[in-house]
Amino acid sequence: MLEKYKKLYPNISDYSIMHFIDIAEFCDMIMDKQKLKNLNEDECYCLLSAALFAHIGFGLNQEIMNRYVDKLGIQKQTEELTFFQVMSKYHVLFSACLLEEYGDIFEFPSDLHKYAIIRMLHFIGENGTALVQLEEALVLNNQNVIRLKELAAVLAVGNQLAELKNANIDLSYDKFDKYNSEEIVGFVERNVVRSIKVKDGKLVIEAGGSDSAYTLIERKVNLIIDNFGKIVSSLSDRSDYSLNLFSIVSIELHRLPSAETAGKNLSEQRNRRIMDR
């Protein structure tokens, strides 16, 4: 679909494929497995399509980005930001704008499918803070129900985790085009987040790196925890809490020792053993 899209709209960078896989994997990780199996085919289609299209807006040129800034009414919020800062902050909303304008080329199964995907993109583009504004569910002509709120909630957290996974304070996106491939690989290998996994109903994030790098990750994780709490609270306001698709009840951050700290600790242990002798 992206290849077809690029032929008709060549100003789009093909950035989103691998990130789409990360989002899908994290959605799978944080969803209740039985409820995941019970999703109907239309819900699966909308969730995966929203994950796929979430970041196609990252490659807009200045002219089209300005047009979408006007359309979204965010001129004031972007006045003091650089092109890349605007793109980094609002690219998911730009993705929604692209689907609104050009989505028909993808031949979605119905207008309701397209509408559901766009609504989810708007939700995660607004940092997952307006769940109450989403419709509870959409009923299709085949009588399948798309649980819009539940899917959007999972997608929002999955997207935030995918972005967290690749966070790296060494990497300057303003200078990204100046890096060669070996340098970019080096950045990826030094990512601060080492693992994200579910343990006993908790999502455990393990991170290392320098103090400054860890502080950045800690700030990002705290935002994810705060958003997750708001999302779950919003879902819990309803009488049927069983509709919640999450398998996790909390998110935790654990710090791993950096290579430098680990080496220092090992050296100290060796010195103590020598002194004991």
Predicted regions mapped to residue ranges:
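Acidic/His-rich, divalent-metal-binding segments that scaffold phosphate/diphosphate chemistry
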Residues: 1-78, 258-277
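Glycine- and acidic
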Residues: 5-12, 80-81, 203-211
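Short secondary-structure junctions and interdomain/linker hinges
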Residues: 5-12, 128, 161-168, 231, ...
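Catalytic cores of large soluble enzymes that bind and process phosphate-bearing ligands
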Residues: 15, 87, 216
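Charged, amphipathic alpha-helical oligomerization/scaffolding segments
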Residues: 18, 22, 153, 223, ...
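A general structural signal for alpha-helical elements within enzymatic catalytic domains
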Residues: 28, 32-35, 100, 104, ...
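Divalent metal-dependent catalytic cores for phosphoryl transfer on phosphate-bearing substrates
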Residues: 35-201
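C-terminal effector/catalytic modules and regulatory tails appended to multi-domain proteins
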Residues: 175-277
